Amino acid sequence: MGLFDFFRGTNINDGIQQFRDTEGALLIDVRGDGEFRQGHIPGSANIPLQRLKDIKKYANKDTPLFLYCLSGARSGRAVNTLVGMGYKAVTNIGGIASYKGEIER
């Protein structure tokens, strides 16, 4: 996947590997707080879709961002929002519902 992946081009498991291989990248779960507490991918930060403006506390506009939600729909909307805010390296990796790895609670 390249920059500005508005639509999921790979599955979340491949996206997690790409995140791990990208120096300085952030993994962001855009689901709500309650969903995040029920289970999330280890190492991810929770910045719900409605609070995306808070991203500036964690990342500059060149930081590689890898976003996920439950199905990939909200993370797709989040990619559009962040690109509109000037972020340059934003990738929608899809939904945690398809994730095969460890879940942190």
Q: Where are the predicted features?
A:
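Rhodanese-like catalytic fold shared by cysteine-dependent sulfurtransferases
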Residues: 2-18, 22-26, 33-64, 73-105
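Short, surface-exposed ligand- or partner-binding patches at beta-edge/loop junctions that are enriched
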Residues: 68
